[in-house]
């Protein structure tokens, strides 16, 4: 997910994207805790995507 793609979305779409990412992060953490997650780098990717979305939401709210 690129930041340029996110800037084109509305705040409502970004909030929906954020909710989906938070759910995905929760599922990945549960898989990691139970030892079912083989691709642990997905946790890092999702965490950074959440940060990207939150940053764009904050910048749109301030503008």
Curated annotation (Swiss-Prot):
PROSITE patterns in the record: RIBOSOMAL_L29
GO biological process per UniProt: translation
Domain of life: Bacteria
InterPro entries named among the record's database cross-references: Ribosomal_protein_uL29 (IPR050063), Ribosomal_uL29 (IPR001854), Ribosomal_uL29_CS (IPR018254), Ribosomal_uL29_sf (IPR036049)
SUPFAM superfamilies: Ribosomal protein L29 (L29p)
GO MF entries: structural constituent of ribosome
Signal sequence coordinates: none
One GO CC term on file: cytosolic large ribosomal subunit
Cell membrane among keywords: no
CDD domains: Ribosomal_L29_HIP
Keyword Ribosomal protein part of the UniProt annotation: yes
Keyword entries, A-Z: Ribonucleoprotein, Ribosomal protein
Protein family: Belongs to the universal ribosomal protein uL29 family.
Protein name stated in the entry: Large ribosomal subunit protein uL29
Gene source species: Shewanella sediminis (strain HAW-EB3)
